[in-house]
Amino acid sequence: ETDVHQLVCKGALQEILSVCTQVRYSGEVVPLDDNMLRRVKRVTDTLNRQGLRVVAVATKYLPAREGDYQRIDESDLILEGYIAFLDPPKETTAPALKALKASGITVKILTGDSELVAAKVCHEVGLDAGDVVIGSNIEGLSDDELATLAQRTTLFARLTPMHKERIVTLLKREGHVVGFMGDGINDAPALRAADIGISVDGAVDIAREAADIILLEKSLMVLEEGVIEGRRTFSNMLKYIKMTASSNFGNVFSVLVASAFLPFLPMLPLHLLIQNLLYDVSQVAIPFDNVDEEQIKKPQRWNPSELGRFMIFFGPISSIFDILTFCLM
């Protein structure tokens, strides 16, 4: 009919049910009462337990008009049915999670999906979900309460984008370094809030723009490989900083001691620069140096006080050789 438009809506089951007042059952439109809601939930819960995601479809006939339809039009809909589809985890998910755990990384699941679907997926990939927390249960919690809950909970389900962002922010506040991986529009706020936002090349544009790293490989094992390489690079970088700082401190200490006892300066500024240049050449091999296994398996943090202790201890030791040389001069 040219004077009538059919509005078709699809989305998460709970969201669609909230705007439906009728349901098409056995070819007839009947009221969506409590009894019918229980029947719908019973069927969809069975599908969710099998790991199937459910998308509800609803319709409504409206008088034809010009222009776009608004959110207010999405009311008094007729529930036509639902579509169940399987979105299995990647084959590399289970070994990647196992490898990350072995590297001291705690994995948490923050999803907008049903808690039944999420729990099924966690079971398939070997992740112990424990007690599931859903989004509606965290809205009334204070930041301190949610921070405590977030640290001991593995699986959060039925989350909104703001829920995800809040959890990530609170985990950071508690001193954790947080990496968040997502590929959808709903993941963008959490990707921005995380220390490291990770997405994939097939993600929506807004997720790729919000991410710090985009994975081009299909295998999730690249995450563990990236962690190992990052820790190796960080360890070797610390070696360079410690060696350079202690060397420079030792040189300055040597000059100060010499100026107190010798009538001349044993090392001019040019000598120090040449010495540092030669020293830097010897440090070219540091990026390729081996790193102890315990340093790779355990996350490390930047600790300035440790650098200070190293510099104060090894700097004067190197100065001993300088001072002995000055005495011979």
What are these language model-derived features?
Residues 129-180, 194-329:
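Membrane-embedded transport module
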Residues 191:
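Basic, alpha-helical nucleic-acid-binding regions used in initiation and control of genome expression
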Residues 1-170, 174, 188, 200-202, ...:
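Cytosolic catalytic headpieces and adjacent flexible linkers of membrane translocases
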